[in-house]
């Protein structure tokens, strides 16, 4: 998979979660903050990243840098996705279904941020199992990575799109 250059895209960021984490040492607890951020150009490119630091803004900055390194391209057909798909990560699972125009983004929390920043404006989704923000984001990314356009599948099979769709 080729890397996407984040400098050529106008990326928008969205903070999905900020957590206070503690490391217990002999003298007490060492507190730090971890941040989960999703970035996207609302035109088929989206990425997520995590960052950890002693201050919240620094954790968010690190997460944004990380997210720009993990960009993926999402195939979009009109305003929705090409086909139904199920994304898995850990105990989290998400079902993504294409929706007719005007439906809007029907998704909960972390998945909504990913789908909106990817540029998908009509989609139905249902999250099952673990609802931890990081697991939901990773499961959504797993689902989005599985998506393929009809043209790509036809090319792989050596057929025309008409032959595939019958």
UniProtKB/Swiss-Prot annotation:
Transmembrane segments: none annotated. GO terms for biological process: response to antibiotic; translation. It comes from the Bacteria. One of its GO terms (molecular function) is structural constituent of ribosome. Keywords: Antibiotic resistance, Ribonucleoprotein, Ribosomal protein, RNA-binding, rRNA-binding. InterPro entries: Ribosomal_Su5_D2-typ_SF (IPR020568), Ribosomal_uS5 (IPR000851), Ribosomal_uS5_bac-type (IPR005712), Ribosomal_uS5_C (IPR005324), Ribosomal_uS5_N (IPR013810), Ribosomal_uS5_N_CS (IPR018192), Ribsml_uS5_D2-typ_fold_subgr (IPR014721). One of its GO terms (cellular component) is small ribosomal subunit. Pfam families: Ribosomal_S5, Ribosomal_S5_C. Residues 11-74 form the S5 DRBM domain. The keyword Transport does not apply. Belongs to the universal ribosomal protein uS5 family. NCBIfam families: rpsE_bact. The N-terminal domain interacts with the head of the 30S subunit; the C-terminal domain interacts with the body and contacts protein S4. The interaction surface between S4 and S5 is involved in control of translational fidelity. With S4 and S12 plays an important role in translational accuracy. Part of the 30S ribosomal subunit. Contacts proteins S4 and S8. This is Small ribosomal subunit protein uS5.
């Amino acid at each position: 998979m080729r890397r996407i250059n984040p400098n050529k895209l106008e990326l928008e960021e969205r903070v999905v979660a900020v957590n206070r984490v503690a490391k217990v040492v002999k003298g007490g607890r060492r507190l730090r903050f971890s941040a989960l951020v999703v970035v996207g150009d609302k035109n088929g490119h989206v990425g997520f990243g995590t960052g950890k630091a002693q201050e919240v803004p620094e954790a968010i900055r690190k997460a944004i840098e990380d997210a720009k390194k993990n960009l993926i391209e999402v195939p979009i057909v009109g305003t929705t996705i090409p086909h139904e798909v199920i994304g898995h990560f850990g105990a989290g699972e998400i079902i993504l279904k294409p929706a007719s125009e005007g439906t809007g983004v029907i998704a909960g929390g972390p998945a909504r941020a990913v789908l909106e920043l990817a540029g998908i404006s009509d989609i139905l989704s249902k999250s099952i199992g673990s609802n931890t923000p990081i697991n939901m984001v990773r499961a959504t990314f797993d689902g989005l990575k599985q998506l393929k356009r009809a043209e790509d599948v036809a090319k792989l099979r050596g057929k025309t799109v008409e032959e595939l769709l019958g």
